[in-house]
Amino acid sequence: MTLGLVGRKVGMTRVFDEQGVSVPVTVLDMSANRVTQVKSKDTDGYTAVQVTFGQKKANRVNKAEAGHFAKAGVEAGRGLIEFALTEEKLAELKAGDEITVSMFEVGQLVDVTGTSKGKGFSGTIKRHNFGAQRTSHGNSRSHRVPGSIGMAQDPGRVFPGKRMAGQYGNTKATVQKLEVVRVDAERQLLLVKGAVPGAVNSDVVVRPSVKVGA
């Protein structure tokens, strides 16, 4: 139950630390996170804060959205997300507040969630790292097939969960315990060590890591 930020993946680059070692980092644009609603147990049955991010053209905002954003006194965003919070942390926020990248600090560990790149319909070798069969020595047109997918008349079926070919990627993915390398409060940029899921310009959610001591 921690507050996070929604940002946009700008791309990857590198920075040099004090020892001159090259550190690969992902640049995340974390600007324009606004609180649109604070939900309490009395009115909603649970405690959470609703946040909008990014910008949306006025002609793309319907009346329901326009009224919701106007009530909060914030600019219309391109999406909404909720973060479950305790009542104590919820008391510190109100509709219209802006959450900035300053909530993170250098050296902190964060979890980054995004939508992985879609690879389309892929076979078992690419999707599940299966080994290929022989390229010759009697093998005819079965070089990349998965092989046996079951047993005999008993059980007479393919068990659920069997790894097979299918849609690969384009799923929600989280990378845990990435180190914050730099926080640019002026430009609202966050630099984290390593790669994060998703393509350039895709949305990502950054939260304080839940496994810091693990």
UniProtKB/Swiss-Prot annotation:
It comes from the Bacteria. Part of the 50S ribosomal subunit. Forms a cluster with proteins L14 and L19. Methylated by PrmB. NCBIfam families: L3_bact (TIGR03625). Belongs to the universal ribosomal protein uL3 family. This is Large ribosomal subunit protein uL3. One of the primary rRNA binding proteins, it binds directly near the 3'-end of the 23S rRNA, where it nucleates assembly of the 50S subunit. GO terms for biological process: translation.
